[in-house]
Amino acid sequence: HILKHNGSKPIRCPECNYTCVNRSMLTSHMKSHSNTYPYRCLDCNYATKY
């Protein structure tokens, strides 16, 4: 919890210069580097990563 207060972001993305406080944030960020779009609209052809 203290990392939030002191501004430390020790977790780094291996693909870019993104840093964060915890691994769950990195897991979410890593979707931005993926070419997969797993969430699709049932009514149209729209798809998203998130």
Curated annotation (Swiss-Prot):
Q: Which GO terms describe its biological process?
A: segmentation
A GO MF annotation of the entry reads: DNA binding
Q: Where in the cell?
A: Nucleus
- InterPro entries to which the protein is assigned, alphabetical: Znf_C2H2_sf, Znf_C2H2_type
Primary site of residence: nucleus
Presence of keyword Ribosomal protein: no
Q: Which domain of life is it from?
A: Eukaryota
- Can the keyword NAD be found in this entry's annotation? no
Q: Name one GO cellular component term.
A: nucleus
Alphabetical UniProt keywords: Developmental protein, DNA-binding, Gap protein, Metal-binding, Nucleus, Repeat, Zinc, Zinc-finger
Q: Where are the zinc fingers (C2H2-type)?
A: 1-5, 11-33, 39-50
**Regions annotated as coiled coil:** none
Q: What does this protein do?
A: Gap class segmentation protein that controls development of head structures.
Please give the family membership noted in the entry: Belongs to the hunchback C2H2-type zinc-finger protein family.
**PANTHER family on file:** PROTEIN HUNCHBACK, ZINC FINGER PROTEIN
**In its UniProt entry, what is this protein called?**
Protein hunchback
